Amino acid sequence: MTYSTTKSVAMNPDEDAPPSDINSSGRLMSHSEVEPRGNGYEVLQQAGTVRILLSRPERGNALSLSLARDLTRLFQTFSAQHSVHRIVLTGKGKYFCSGMDLGEELYEDATERCLALQDLFGAIDACPKTTVAVINGPAFGGGVGLAFVCDIRVAVSTSFFCLSEVKLGLCPATVSRFIIREWGVSLARMAMLTARKIHPQALQEMGVLHAVALDEEALKVVTENLLDDLGFAAPQASAWCKALTRKTRNGNGDHDQFARQIFETMVAPGSESEYGVAQFRRGRKNIRWEQAECLHTR
């Protein structure tokens, strides 16, 4: 059985067509897709999962201007690739991300740097793929934003989150809206004003961290279990879940009309649901969507 990727209604970029051209082998991605290594990052793809590793451990995986631009390009590229279902972001070494690279000149290119960071967080926030932050260590400033702009976040118990900008006469200008959105006004304001370390256990209790692992090995297990669960989520349906969440969160436009458009499209002939429901009726309740026959054709 096959289904078409043609859509019957015009949707926004959050609702990409279902993926195809599945790549089943784990590998560094080829130069024809993206550079597998860059100045501060590495990229690995296995089946429908892309892993982006921040690889500036000597700088705490700090966000240089060039790294911010490269990450923006990666997320924009993967947003349009049918073979990508999920994007995992993590760090190499002790830190997840120590925020903006303060070793660079901040004042001469302030506007350029601000726009680059806004583009980065905007690209992750608008990405139709499921994004997962695997927080392997402490996060500061913009690194906190990187974690909490992602859809799902898991962390090691020894990590913490610190909005330390105020100590240097700065504030988390580019990430504040994501922190306030995910943490809530009260906690976000306190964290920004005091620069206190916020520990993962507290954020897990609030539901904004979705798992806390005891150590690095346990974090690997938690991550793989999560990715295994996500493998049963249909890619277009997942993108629609994100679009509906964004529509409700932003409170703009007619949500009911938007939901009706999605409903009509998701049950149309040639949709993911046609295949999924047919499999369910045959007694197959879990579909590994990367391996589904319908995804190999258009």
From Swiss-Prot:
Catalytic activities: a (3S)-3-hydroxyacyl-CoA = a (2E)-enoyl-CoA + H2O; a 4-saturated-(3S)-3-hydroxyacyl-CoA = a (3E)-enoyl-CoA + H2O
GO-annotated molecular function: enoyl-CoA hydratase activity
Gene3D superfamilies, alphabetized: 2-enoyl-CoA Hydratase, Chain A, domain 1
UniProt xrefs under InterPro entries: ClpP/crotonase-like_dom_sf, Enoyl-CoA_hydra/iso, Enoyl-CoA_Hydratase/Isomerase
Start and end residues of each stretch annotated as Disordered: 1-39
EC category name: lyase
Signal peptide: none
Its EC number(s): 4.2.1.-
UniProt-listed Pfam families: ECH_1 (PF00378)
Keywords tagged on the record: Lyase, Virulence
Annotated pathway: Mycotoxin biosynthesis
PANTHER family assigned to the protein according to its UniProt record, in alphabetical order: ENOYL-COA HYDRATASE, POLYKETIDE BIOSYNTHESIS ENOYL-COA HYDRATASE PKSH-RELATED
Family listed: Belongs to the enoyl-CoA hydratase/isomerase family.
Extra information: Gene clusters encoding host-selective toxins (HSTs) are localized on conditionally dispensable chromosomes (CDCs), also called supernumerary chromosomes, where they are present in multiple copies. The CDCs are not essential for saprophytic growth but controls host-selective pathogenicity.
Its biological purpose: Enoyl-CoA hydratase; part of the gene clusters that mediate the biosynthesis of the host-selective toxins (HSTs) AF-toxins responsible for Alternaria black spot of strawberry disease by the strawberry pathotype. AF-toxin I and III are valine derivatives of 2,3-dyhydroxy-isovaleric acid and 2-hydroxy-isovaleric acid respectively, while AF II is an isoleucine derivative of 2-hydroxy-valeric acid. These derivatives are bound to a 9,10-epoxy-8-hydroxy-9-methyl-decatrienoic acid (EDA) moiety.
The protein's name: Enoyl-CoA hydratase AFT6-1
Lineage of the species this protein comes from: Eukaryota, Fungi, Dikarya, Ascomycota, Pezizomycotina
Gene: AFT6-1
